């Protein structure tokens, strides 16, 4: 999209290919969340939890779905109307008004260390002090950030974005359009040891690969270990947050999401379209079927074979947890009732004793 300082609402609508309701000449020069937006901002409403702001916002325009535009049309405000998912159109506006910051190091920096056997594709950017190992392959239009390492025999597809200080060890295979945030480590050895008769632990070599398919995103300081014999696999479209630990020979299906500080132990298989909440712990050698949602801090100790929402430790269906929480909340009242019953029983006991001693 072309970039300039100010757009009319109609110009934005044409760029986004959406409809306008209201004053098409309204000037827009920035983006802001609905609660803070001023007259020169465009904002959006995606979650109805924030609908209370739509009446009071000073935004120059609001991006809404068709259903929302019908619901709030009486407010006499400027709307950009999309078929669904206002947040997607808003993201395009962000890209218009806040262009990405370039590093200032186009091409291959002279301090980068590239093995002579490595293959570097067309239009690749390699920033200062990055290291590309022997027989590594960097696909066209990919970007390797400052101080990052791509190990020997590793493969990166086209249009990958590897931020600074990423470690991609040897024999890692990464698909197209993969984004890896700073500090991530891909292909480290798994946590596998054998303990001898004297109680000493000896590390086992891990010879498998890590395979990252197309359109995967990996957060900052996340670690993905290679398998001992077989590969660790992250399937296409999966998004992984910061500080996630994925152990050896884990397989994660397509278009799943893993939130920060989750940990998945070795040889576990995760299905497609699974959501793993923050700080969730998943034990090893189990499987989780498709379309499972794990709430934050869930402790998964055995396989999950039915889609649905799970939580607690050990993990159990959300409805069961909800019932248990309701009972726990009722404990103070139950304690009060028990106390009252105890007092009544004591009173009855005293009266009974008095009746027995009365001649």
From Swiss-Prot:
GO terms for MF: N-acyltransferase activity
Catalytic activity: a UDP-3-O-[(3R)-3-hydroxyacyl]-alpha-D-glucosamine + a (3R)-hydroxyacyl-[ACP] = a UDP-2-N,3-O-bis[(3R)-3-hydroxyacyl]-alpha-D-glucosamine + holo-[ACP] + H(+)
Metabolic or biological pathway, per its Swiss-Prot or TrEMBL entry: Bacterial outer membrane biogenesis; LPS lipid A biosynthesis
InterPro entries: Hexapep, LpxD, Trimer_LpxA-like_sf, UDP_GlcNAc_AcTrfase_non-rep
A Gene Ontology term for the protein's cellular component: membrane
Pfam families cross-referenced by the UniProt entry: Hexapep, LpxD
Record's keyword terms, sorted: Acyltransferase, Lipid A biosynthesis, Lipid biosynthesis, Lipid metabolism, Repeat, Transferase
Keyword set includes Acyltransferase: yes
Residue positions of the active site: 248
E.C. code: 2.3.1.191
GO biological process, one term: lipid A biosynthetic process
Family: Belongs to the transferase hexapeptide repeat family. LpxD subfamily.
Complexes and interactors: Homotrimer.
UniProt cross-references to NCBIfam families, sorted A to Z: lipid_A_lpxD, PRK00892.1
Task of the protein: Catalyzes the N-acylation of UDP-3-O-acylglucosamine using 3-hydroxyacyl-ACP as the acyl donor. Is involved in the biosynthesis of lipid A, a phosphorylated glycolipid that anchors the lipopolysaccharide to the outer membrane of the cell.
Protein known as: UDP-3-O-acylglucosamine N-acyltransferase
Organism of provenance: Chlamydia caviae (strain ATCC VR-813 / DSM 19441 / 03DC25 / GPIC) (Chlamydophila caviae)
Gene it is expressed from: lpxD
């Amino acid at each position: 999209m072309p970039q300039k300082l100010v757009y009319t609402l109609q110009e934005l609508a044409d760029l986004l290919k959406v409809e306008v309701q209201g004053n098409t000449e309204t000037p827009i020069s920035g983006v802001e969340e609905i609660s803070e937006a001023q007259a020169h901002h465009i904002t959006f409403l995606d979650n109805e939890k924030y609908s209370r702001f739509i009446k009071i916002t000073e935004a120059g325009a609001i991006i809404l779905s068709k259903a929302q535009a019908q619901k709030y049309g009486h407010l006499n405000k400027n709307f950009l109307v999309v078929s669904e998912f206002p947040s997607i159109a808003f993201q395009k506006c962000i890209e218009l008004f806040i262009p990405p910051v370039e590093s200032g190091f186009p091409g291959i920096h002279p301090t980068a260390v590239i093995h002579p056997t490595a293959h570097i594709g067309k239009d690749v950017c390699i920033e200062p002090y990055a290291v590309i190992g022997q027989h590594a392959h960097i696909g066209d239009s990919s970007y390797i950030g400052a101080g990052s390492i791509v190990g020997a025999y590793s493969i990166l597809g086209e249009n990958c974005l590897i931020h600074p200080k990423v470690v991609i060890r040897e024999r890692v295979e990464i698909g197209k359009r993969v984004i890896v945030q700073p500090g991530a480590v891909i292909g480290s050895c798994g946590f596998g040891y054998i303990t001898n008769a004297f109680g000493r632990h000896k590390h086992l070599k891990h010879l498998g690969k890590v395979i990252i398919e197309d359109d995967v995103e990996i957060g900052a300081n996340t670690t993905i270990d290679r398998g001992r014999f077989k590969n660790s696999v992250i399937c296409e479209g999966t998004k992984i947050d910061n500080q996630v630990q994925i152990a050896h020979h884990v397989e994660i299906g397509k278009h799943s999401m893993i939130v920060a500080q989750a940990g998945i132990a070795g040889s576990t298989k995760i299905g497609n379209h699974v959501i793993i909440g923050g700080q969730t712990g998943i034990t090893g050698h189990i499987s989780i079927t498709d379309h499972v949602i794990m709430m934050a801090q869930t402790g998964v100790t055995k396989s999950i074979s039915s889609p649905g929402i799970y939580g607690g430790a050990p993990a159990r269906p959300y409805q069961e947890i909800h019932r248990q929480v309701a009972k726990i909340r009722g404990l103070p009242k139950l304690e009060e009732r028990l106390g009252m019953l105890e007092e009544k029983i004591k009173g009855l006991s005293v009266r009974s004793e008095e009746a027995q001693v009365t001649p």
